[in-house]
Every structure is written in C-alpha cells, then in structure tokens.
Amino acid sequence: MRVVLIGRGRLATNLLPALQEAGHEVVSINSRTLEGLPTEADVFVVAVKDSALKDVISQATKGREQQLFVHTAGSIPMSLFEGYTSRYGVFYPMQTFSKERLVDFAEVPVFVEGECPQIRQLAESMSHRVYALSSEHRKYLHLAAVFACNFANHCYALSAELLEKHGLPFDVMLPLIDETARKVHGLHPLDAQTGPAVRYDENVIRLQSALLSDTPALQEIYDLLSLSIHRKAQ
C-alpha cells in the first residue's frame, strides 16, 4: 500500500519502520506544517497527540474527502472524522512507545474499526494480533492500559526517587519488576499480588506510611494503594 504517515512523535517514529518492513511505500509528513502532503494514497494515518487530532484532520482532509483516513488514538471515537471525509476508521496499536526504543510491531495488539477492508489489511500486514473493536469498547481498553502501563511506570518513578534519596540504585529493582511482569502471564493479577497490604500487616503498613511523613503526596499514594490492595484481597 501507499501510506501517508502524518506525525513524527513517539508512535509515528515506531510506525514508520514497521510500515516499511511490511512492504508499504511510506510518505512521512510533519503534522505541524503538512508540507508535501499528497492528494492521494491508499490510506492516510494520522498519528498525532489527542489534543491536536481534530485540527490536523480538518486540515489534512481538505481536497481529500474521498480518501481513506485513520487515526491511532485509543480514547478518541471514530466519529471524529464525520464531516471531514467519507472513508475513515481507527488503527490503534496498544503499546507504550518511545523514540529511543523501537518495538517489535509484530507482537503489538492492533485494534481496528471501520468499514474499509484496507484498515484490517494494513494491520494484519504488520501485526499477528489484530482485533476489531468499537469506539465504545476501545475507550475502556485505553483506560485499562493507563492503569497497567502509565500508572505502573509512575510507581517505578516514585520508587526510583525514593531509592535515589537514600543513595540506592534503581537497578536493584529490575529483577523484582521483571518477575512481577512475568507472573501475570500465568496468574490472574489478584493471585499474583504479594506484600504487606494483601495480608494487611498493619504494623508494617503503619511503619512504612510513617517513613513517608515528610512527603505527604507520596504518603497519600501509599495509603490509598495499600487500602485498595487490601480490599481486593478480601
């Protein structure tokens, strides 16, 4: 396929080589200027941040109202395209992306929506895990991903800050992090949960909470998560 990739952020940086490796002809376009945007392609992929999506779509579709456009956002409905183009859909790769570390796209779950068969064909050319999903269900999928990825990584950052404050290296946590992730491949997360909160060891919880008294925001997070873990364990 001839694919126009609009955007040069983290996702687009990973999409470009994945599309090329799958054998597609790719034109990469800067979303801020749209300079050199072709008038025709098999599919236009809009891979920009959610807050810029509507503006980019409104500009990119001008004169291309019969072209196929897809966006890559997990929490934005497909209906955003209505009134801009007659052929549209969603191509949502559910993964955490960084410019510095390219992922193996063949293992990335891709969730598609839309009537045009080219959308699924594009996804299947790049990934072994392709699923049809409506906008209504996709917003809950994205929400669940925020808990599983973004919040988990934030806890890593909090752990790193705490260790640094006391002169300890973060890499001592890596075996623990790796084993925690491996366990949920074979166990339900509730069954994999360990630590003082799951058994509600009040003495340990109270002591650890007190250690955070000089950082009330972190103490609040600790107390809230401990209570949530305890309630889920009951």
Regions found by a protein language model. Give the residues of each.
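Rossmann-like NAD(P)(H) cofactor-binding subdomain of soluble oxidoreductases
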Residues: L16-Q20, R32-L102
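Internal alpha-helical scaffold of NAD(P)-dependent oxidoreductase catalytic cores
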Residues: L15, A22-E25, L102-H185
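Interdomain hinge/lid region at the active-site interface
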Residues: T180-Q234
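NAD(P)+-binding Rossmann beta1-loop-alpha1 motif at the extreme N-terminus of oxidoreductases
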Residues: M1-L37
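Structural signal for conserved beta-strand scaffold positions within catalytic alpha/beta enzyme cores
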Residues: S28, H71, G89-V90, F111-V112, ...
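Hydrophobic anchor at the start of a short beta-strand
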Residues: V3, V26-V27, Q67, Y88, ...
